[in-house]
């Protein structure tokens, strides 16, 4: 591997390790939280509504229990990182969306990969 290319990859890894994005750090503390972040942000950018149940179904079954997955979502919602909305057409459906601050910080996080 060329030295310049290697140094570029090392710089990316350094910035990923040393960023100060508080909300992203919260989701990086646990694999389940990180997967939830990626699913919620993908849905947000695709302008899709993801129910809590669909998010749980999207998570690998072997990384955590359903209770842990729900606890992760509840914790993120309580902190205001994720917003829980009830469907207007079906009150049983609950959607999870990122907060504006999370969208901004996630955008900064993605720039670390692209710059």
Residue map of PLM features:
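A short, conserved structural fragment
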Residues: 77-87
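Short alpha-helical segments that sit at the start of domains
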Residues: 10-40
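Amphipathic alpha-helical dimerization/coiled-coil segments
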Residues: 12, 20, 107-115
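Short, cationic-aromatic polyanion-contact patches
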Residues: 87-110
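Short amphipathic alpha-helical interaction segments
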Residues: 63-78
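Short acidic, hydrophobic short linear motifs in intrinsically disordered regions
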Residues: 46-59
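Regular secondary-structure segments
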Residues: 41-45
């Amino acid at each position: 591997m060329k030295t310049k290319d290697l140094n570029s990859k090392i710089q990316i890894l350094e910035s990923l390790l040393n960023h100060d994005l508080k909300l992203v750090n919260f989701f990086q503390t646990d694999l389940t939280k990180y997967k939830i972040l990626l699913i919620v942000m993908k849905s947000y950018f695709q302008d899709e509504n993801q129910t809590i149940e669909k998010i749980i179904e999207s998570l690998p079954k072997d990384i955590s229990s359903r209770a842990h997955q729900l606890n992760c979502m509840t914790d993120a919602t309580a902190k205001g990182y994720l917003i829980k909305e009830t469907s207007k057409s079906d009150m049983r459906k609950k959607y999870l969306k990122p907060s504006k601050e999370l969208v901004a910080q996630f955008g900064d996080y993605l720039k670390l990969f692209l710059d």
